[in-house]
Amino acid sequence: MFEPMELTNDAVIKVIGVGGGGGNAVEHMVRERIEGVDFFAVNTDAQALRKTAVGQTIQIGSGITKGLGAGANPEVGRHSAEEDREALRAALEGADMVFIAAGMGGGTGTGAAPVVAEVAKDQGILTVAVVAKPFNFEGKKRMAFAEQGIAELSKHVDSLITIPNDKLLKVLGRGISLLDAFGAANDVLKGAVQGIAELITRPGLMNVDFADVRTVMSEMGYAMMGSGVACGEDRAEEAAEMAISSPLLEDIDLSGARGVLVNITAGFDLRLDEFETVGNTIRAFASDNATVVIGTSLDPDMNDELRVTVVATGIGMDKRPEITLVTNKQSSQRVMDNLYRDHAAGMSSLNQEQKTAAKAVNEQNAQGSKEPDYLDIPAFLRKQAD
C-alpha cells in the first residue's frame, strides 16, 4: 500500500552574526523581517547577547572569558569558539547555506568566525562570509589582526566578501551619522541575503533551485554582492545600476568572476522589456568565463518597485575556458548571454567594542576635509544627493 509522503524542498538558510559587529548586522536584518531565514548571534559577551533582538543566541567561551568578552584578543575568541564547538555544530545542523557576518580586528569576530566557518564546512554547508575591516585610525595592530583573521577565514568559506570601514566616509560623505553609515552598509548584506532567499523560496517566471545557487556560490574566492530597488519608468535600469555598483566594498578586479547569480523581484507588472533592460545593463560587467544563474521572483506586494540582486563569486581565481549558462526551467540566452561582471555590495557592521570610532569620525568632521570626487560616486548615489 502506498502512503502519502510529505515533501520539504525549501533550502534552509541561516545567518550567523559573530561578535559585536556581526551581531549588530544580524540584528538589523531581524528588524527588517526577512522571511525564510534563521538568525543566530554568537558572542563571548553575555551582556551583548542579553540585549540583542536576535532570538537565537550562543554564548561561547564562558569558561575562558566568564561572559566578559574576548578583550580584543583574537586568540581568546578562537579558543572560546573551540570550547563550544559542539554548540555551534548543533546550531548549524540542517542548514543548506550559511552566511557568517563579523567585524574583523577585534577579539570574538576575528578569532571565532573562522571556527564557525570550519564547523559549517565540515557539515558540507555552503558557506559565505561577509566581514568588515577596521578604520585606519584604529591602528596598525587592529588592522593586522583583521588581515590575519580574513586570511584564516578564507580557508574555510566558499565565498568571502570584505568591506573596509574607511569606504563609508568616502562614499557616504563626512556629514553622515555613524549609525546611518553602518546602517546603509548593513542594508547591502540584507539585500543580498533577501535576494537569495527569495530566489529559492518565492515562485517566479524563471524558478531557480538551491542546486543552481550552490553552483555559483561554491566558486572559491572573493565575492561581491549587490542589491538595488527602484520605482518608476526607468526602475529596471536604475535598480540594475545600483546592484552592480559596490562603493562600500574592497577594490577588487571583477573581470575574473567565475560565478554570477542574478535575481529580479517585482510584482505581476514586470515587463519583458524590463527583464531585457536588466540584462543589458549588467551585460557590460560580465566575464566571458562565468557560470551564470538567473531567475525572477514575483512579489504581489511590490506594486511599482523592482529589485535586482547580483552576486559575483570566484573573484581572484584562475579563469576557466568554458562558459556555462544556467537558466533553470526556462531558457533566456537571448537576454542574458554573458551576464555580469562588476561591483556588488556587502555589509558592514557596527562593532560594539569600538566606541572610539564615533569620537574619531566627529573629530575629522570638525577639522574638515575635501569632499569625495563627484564622479567617483556611483550614479544612484549622486541622484539621491541631487
Curated annotation (Swiss-Prot):
It is found in: Cytoplasm. GO terms for molecular function: GTP binding; GTPase activity. Gene3D superfamilies: Tubulin/FtsZ, C-terminal domain, Tubulin/FtsZ, GTPase domain. PROSITE patterns: FTSZ_1, FTSZ_2. The keyword Nucleotide-binding applies. It comes from the Bacteria. The keyword Cell division applies. Residues 350-377 are annotated as: Disordered. Keywords: Cell cycle, Cell division, Cytoplasm, GTP-binding, Nucleotide-binding, Septation. GO terms for biological process: division septum assembly; FtsZ-dependent cytokinesis; protein polymerization. GO terms for cellular component: cell division site; cytoplasm. GTP binds at residues 20-24, 107-109, 138, 142, 186. Signal peptide: none annotated. Homodimer. Polymerizes to form a dynamic ring structure in a strictly GTP-dependent manner. Interacts directly with several other division proteins. NCBIfam families: ftsZ (TIGR00065). Belongs to the FtsZ family. Essential cell division protein that forms a contractile ring structure (Z ring) at the future cell division site. The regulation of the ring assembly controls the timing and the location of cell division. One of the functions of the FtsZ ring is to recruit other cell division proteins to the septum to produce a new cell wall between the dividing cells. Binds GTP and shows GTPase activity. This is Cell division protein FtsZ. It comes from Sodalis glossinidius. The lineage of its organism: Bacteria, Pseudomonadati, Pseudomonadota, Gammaproteobacteria, Enterobacterales.
